[in-house]
Amino acid sequence: MKLNKKKIKIISVVGTRPEIIRLSRIFSVLDKYCEHVLVHTGQNYDYELNQIFFDDLKIRKPDFFLNISKNSKSVANTIGNLITAVDELFDKVQPDAILVLGDTNSCLSVIPAKRRKIPIFHMEAGNRCFDQRVPEEINRKIIDHVADIHLPYSSIAREYLLKEGINADQIIKIGSPMFEVLNYYLPKIKKSKITSKLKLKKNNYFVVSVHREENIDSNVNFNKIVQIINMVAENYKLPVIISTHPRTQKKLNLQKIKFHSKVNFIKPLGFCDYVNLQMHAKTVLSDSGTITEESSILNFPALNIRETHERPEGMEEGAVMMVGLEVTRVFKGLDILKNQSKEKKRMINIVEDYNVPNVSEKVLRIIHSYIDYVNRLVWKKFS
């Protein structure tokens, strides 16, 4: 009998910064052990938002760029472009499996994959904020109930999947990939000169990051965020550094808003510069999903300025404080965090499900182990 040495052909689909960052180490092992086809959908594509991260993290050029957002007039239009483009790509590439991470529109590429009976592996499965106003919450439920193998980060996310009727044998908890990513790039992060470049004194400035649709597109929420930013600058008399996402910049361009003189807007930074900036800030105020993991792993004080969130495991350790969009809650949070030590002796333990050094190897082995399982048990394909 002749041994089949053909590598598994896996297609991974990304379209935003968080996906690129979280999958950076996984791309490396897939390139080594599989026939890996890397696809960028073009969901968010310009140098600041994407290419700078490919360069910074030394990720190879994608095999395909789909440009789904070009001339798109609506979210529905973008999603339609995605499904059509990805389906045509599947016909060309003929992958053995697809890997997606998270809850972006790009992850909806699982829909044509399902129709073509391609085994689907979903990282970050099971995250729930239980708020239908959050567009990602809708995507999460669609992706989770289409995917074949679910790879949640936490035990809580695993329980959510079970309660929604997902079979236990199709759920494998892997932990967050961010510990592996941050530790791999930590030497480069520490070498960053971003604080001196921006003329900032360590622990004497704030970092603010806001980009979520429910915060920016709502005038009520956006005005609350503006008030928070100005009040922090006014009361602390310290620089407030804001890395501007295109959605945020677009909103700022439409409205003539007066900001405090201590508020500084900068273009989006590369991964290593931005993480360094967060590590040396007095406090980070953010509506990002990643802030819970980053603040827990790297031990810096952070406030989550959202009304809902999807990482309760972070709250169990107090890794980040949820303060919503009310000024009084923000300032109470800042007062509590002012004594948080950044030294090696932690005040707050790292979240257990984030303290995982080998997620990339886990994912590689799970994909190799479960492609045949999906083909046999889901699609009844018998060789």
Predicted regions and their residues:
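Active-site and donor-binding regions of nucleotide-sugar-utilizing enzymes
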Residues: 8-14, 19-29, 33, 53, ...
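N-terminal glycine-rich anion-binding loop in soluble enzyme alpha/beta folds
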Residues: 32-62, 68
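Donor-nucleotide binding loops and adjacent catalytic segments primarily
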Residues: 43-46, 51, 190-280, 381
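A nucleotide-sugar donor-handling region in carbohydrate enzymes
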Residues: 43-48, 69, 146-221, 323
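Short alpha-helical donor nucleotide-sugar binding micro-motif in glycosyltransferases
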Residues: 86, 90, 276-281
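A donor-sugar binding/catalytic signature common to diverse glycosyltransferases
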Residues: 100-101, 107-110, 122-123, 150, ...
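C-terminal amphipathic helix plus adjacent low-complexity
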Residues: 339-383
